């Protein structure tokens, strides 16, 4: 399953790696949206709000885990690019050990804190019971959710984006089937949505483990690889921690924005929750470019080919920008019927259309700074991604959303525009940092 990405056409390598990841991301987004869509078909606005708020919290947890795993992807990629499979095996073994410990810790803390957490995010009173039920079930399943995401990160470090696609396809199909069963005939509401998500990812992990045993990976993992090694864990955390904190802060910003929407009432809360799900689907290419640039650049830097790594960044940013412009034009035309797929409430559709027409512009700028973030991580400088995101959140995204909510009580459009404004600032910082370090010759350092 290991694949070398350091030779041949850079553009072709991007497409070869990115297309399976694109499909994987689409499938993962699809099963995430299935919870909200099926809940909207069978339940009321209170259940929609519960699932929207609960899934927002779970998405935050997931991106923190995936962000931390970026360290594993990069370290494995460096080892594969350099042809050192022993280092790759050590990185994989220590990744498994680290993340199983992290997942058990998350489970213990979050199950105990679920009610205070729901109170903290300001869920409307009507949706509190459903949100608590949803999160309790999902928190119990954190070890399986972690394993599900870590398996994909390891394979991408090996240059294999196809195998995770198959595992995600299993989870997607299972989640949709279970959601229909649990939320429809069994009328379990948010509980059914949580069960569908957790059980489907558990099934995917089981399938992945069987798949790994049946295919030749070129790796020989031993018990020694799973013993914690300070040097290996240090390299993983050096890259992964800034990305995890960065992604966590981004999700905190989203939750703060959700809290702002919650305080505007049930209708606006439901509208923002639905749009967040749609936006996550629209981010399929920006997110794919982040993963693609980090994996390809890691292998190329490990192989001593920094020029190919820079070309990867260039092509990825161009692809993401073109995609973003196309998505903006399409959403402006189909916003109403798209929102109507998730709810029959005309007022929720109206407010959601206002929000998404401002928010969707973010796909243009996010694609660029996502590409830079992946590149900086591959260069061993993931702290730059952390810094530009924190600055954008603190100076623009959160205060912009708050002020827009206070100044424009009758519309969600200005709130939606806060996101692309923050991403534009991130792009400016990324370009400036890249040019400055390139002139100084300090871009490429060992991870």
Regions found by a protein language model. Give the residues of each.
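Helix-terminus/linker motif at the lipid-water interface of multi-pass membrane proteins
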Residues: 30-49, 118-125, 181-188, 248-281, ...
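Short runs within selected transmembrane alpha-helices of multi-pass transporters and secretion channels
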Residues: 138-156, 164-172, 193-208, 287-290, ...
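Signature of the first transmembrane helix
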Residues: 12-73, 77, 241-261
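Small-residue-rich hydrophobic transmembrane alpha-helices
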Residues: 48-108, 145-164, 258, 271-329, ...
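Small-residue hotspots at the loop-to-helix junctions and early N-terminal turns
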Residues: 43-56, 135, 194, 266-281, ...
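Short alpha-helical transmembrane segments in multi-pass integral membrane proteins
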Residues: 1-18, 76-143, 185-241, 297-362, ...
